[in-house]
From Swiss-Prot:
EC numbers, comma separated: 3.4.-.-
GO cellular component labels: extracellular region
GO biological process: proteolysis
Organism, scientific name: Haementeria depressa (Leech)
Protein name: Hementerin
Length: 30
């Protein structure tokens, strides 16, 4: 990915761009 296109799933790379809380939120929504 890239910063312009964050992955829909929570991944290590995603943590670099978004806070862990946001990552967990994405999982809950999905």
């Amino acid at each position: 990915x890239t910063l312009s296109e964050p992955e829909p799933t929570c991944s290590i790379e995603y943590f670099r761009y978004q806070a862990i809380e946001d990552c967990e939120y994405s999982i809950s929504v999905k």
